[in-house]
Amino acid sequence: AGCKYLFGSCKEDSDCCKHLGCRRKAPQYCGWDGTF
């Protein structure tokens, strides 16, 4: 499966690649979580 990249659709943070987190509200996509 692999992880979702920036702006990839998601349901939770674990769907996203490292340093990305899932947005809590619509539209739900992976965004940078502020970490390096």
From Swiss-Prot:
Something else the entry says is: Exists in two forms, due to cis-trans isomerization at 33-Asp-Gly-34. The cis isomer also acts by shifting activation of the Nav1.7/SCN9A channel to more depolarized voltages.
Family assignment from sequence similarity: Belongs to the neurotoxin 10 (Hwtx-1) family.
Q: Which residues carry this modification: Phenylalanine amide?
A: 36
Pfam families per record: Toxin_12
Q: Which SUPFAM superfamilies match?
A: omega toxin-like
Q: Name one GO molecular function term.
A: toxin activity
Q: What is known of its domains?
A: The presence of a 'disulfide through disulfide knot' structurally defines this protein as a knottin.
Q: Which UniProt keywords apply?
A: Amidation, Disulfide bond, Ion channel impairing toxin, Neurotoxin, Secreted, Toxin, Voltage-gated sodium channel impairing toxin
Q: List the disulfide bonds.
A: 3-17, 10-22, 16-30
This protein's name: Beta/delta/mu-theraphotoxin-Pv1
Q: Name a GO CC annotation attached to this entry.
A: extracellular space
UniProt xrefs under InterPro entries: Huwentoxin-1
Indicate whether Transferase appears among the record's keywords. Answer: no
Kindly state the tissue distribution recorded for this protein.
Answer: Expressed by the venom gland.
Q: What does this protein do?
A: Gating-modifier toxin that targets voltage-gated sodium channels. Inhibits the inactivation of Nav1.7/SCN9A.
The listed locations are:
Secreted
